Amino acid sequence: MAGRESPPPSAPSMAPISFGFTRTSVRRRLADLGDSERQAPEEKDFLATVEGRKLQSVNPPEAPKELVIPLIQNGSRRQPLSKNPKPSSETSTVLMSDGVLSQAVKELIEESKKSLEERENAGVDPTLTIPMIQKGCTPIEEGSDSEPQAETVPEEADYEAVPVEAYGLAMLRGMGWKPGKGIGNTFSQVVKPRVNSIRPKGLGLGANRMEAQDLASVGSHHPPRPDGDRENDKEGQPQGLMHGRAVVVLSGPYRGLYGKVEGLDPDNVRAMVRLAVGNRIVTVSEYCLRPVSQQEFDSHTSKPGHVSQTSTEQQNRATGTASSLKAAQNQEDSKRRQKGSEKKRKHSPDRQDGPVPKTEKAAPRNKHWLHRDLRVRFIDKLHKSGRYYNTKMTIEDVLSPDTCVCRTDEGRVLEDVREDMLETLIPKGEGHRVMVVLGPHAGKVGLLRSRDRAQSHALVQLRRENQVVELHYNAICQYMGPGDSDED
């Protein structure tokens, strides 16, 4: 054995080493959700009758069920009190076992003290966890790995079973609501909900629906015709409005005029109609139009006598609506101006209760009260669309006896202001300067001492004469300029 020679060590092989990985994919068979449905037997239904567009089945239809969504109760529950009292024998047994219970309580207290001392000596455990008991769930027991289970686990929501329009009633039924049952604890009563119907387009809150429906019957009434003619009229009578259709206006300023529809505005329920008389395009509400046949349109627009008499009057009425309205407005404005001139204070030196002689009536008024630096009130409602009506201003310059230039408190200058557009202004407080504008003391400046509103009189102390005079409100005006000594 010792003499046997050991074989020489083999030289390391230089062959390359390679590693390979293979992956085998196993096709897993997923559970087919439709297997259970396929296995269920299919119920065949047979057709019994066909009524119009409805198919009547052999099997009776299922009665609709009231959907109820139950209300989830609150998790904070209390233990109900026991209704059955304990018998007397049990009470005696409890009294006898009080000593045993007290001894057990003492032992528990001693054990808790020992465990507390051990924890204080050992320190705080960083991995200590206290499980949280969820609301409405039962706590888990020691040694069990299961999670706390809720006492009332909600079912999986089936959204297809409850339509959107029935969701609200289903919720109310789950809360205890029933149809016809009053709501409330003290004064329970059934309150019917108010359902607002959508108004037709083009009819606002002030419009009457019945009037809009009656417009169709306002048109021209034809004498009764035979049944054959009536049927022909119904067949030839167009229905609805469209571009190029002949119509007649039933109400409004263009009532009785014929035309053709040029365009429709469905948002505002209005139509653009080209009138046959005048060839004008007007905008009319669709409720005021009635479609007519082409024959009726030609018969009312091609007769020269008819056009010359009725249509011309209608055209004049339609075209003259704006002018008549303007004339009426001007007439009303003139009446208002006349009433305003009667109501405002008239600046006349002497007033007589008796009749005025004709010579005095015919005599022109040559006394004017305009003066510089007077504080006046603008009373014309028509000037600049009433922008300066009842505005206080100061006379800057007098261009003529009855024309002046005024300046407002904001600095705006009004030129060519007539005397009848202004009214004298009386200061409210005593001690303000006023100017006498009418009478023998016209042009003099004084101080206002007192006022008598009932008699429209005021006591004015004239500076130069140093006397107190009683004047009417129409004869004085608030003065904003220098004293009367500087005016001479």
Swiss-Prot record:
Matching Pfam families: G-patch_2, GPKOW_C, KOW
Annotated region (Disordered), positions in chain: 1-20, 72-97, 216-241, 295-367
Phosphoserine found at: 25, 115, 485
Bias (Polar residues): 73-95, 307-331
GO biological process: mRNA splicing, via spliceosome
Cellular localization per UniProt: Nucleus
Residue numbers of N-acetylalanine PTMs: 2
Gene3D superfamilies hit by this protein: 2.30.30.30
SMART domains noted in UniProt: G_patch (SM00443), KOW (SM00739)
Keywords: Acetylation, mRNA processing, mRNA splicing, Nucleus, Phosphoprotein, Repeat, RNA-binding
Domain KOW: 231-258, 401-428
Bias-annotated ranges (Basic and acidic residues): 224-236, 332-341, 349-363
Nucleus recorded as keyword: yes
PTM text: Phosphorylation regulates its ability to bind RNA.
G-patch domain location: 164-210
A single Gene Ontology CC term: spliceosomal complex
Gene Ontology MF term list: RNA binding
InterPro entries: G_patch_dom, GPKOW_KOW1, GPKOW_KOW2, KOW, Rib_uL2_dom2, Spp2-like, Spp2/MOS2_G-patch, Translation_prot_SH3-like_sf
Listed CDD domains: KOW_GPKOW_A, KOW_GPKOW_B
Regions of compositional bias (Pro residues) in chain numbering: 1-11
Domain of life assignment: Eukaryota
Subunit structure: Component of the minor spliceosome, which splices U12-type introns. Interacts with PRKX, PRKACB and DHX16.
UniProt similarity note: Belongs to the MOS2 family.
Function comment: RNA-binding protein involved in pre-mRNA splicing. As a component of the minor spliceosome, involved in the splicing of U12-type introns in pre-mRNAs.
Protein's recorded name: G-patch domain and KOW motifs-containing protein
Organism field: Mus musculus
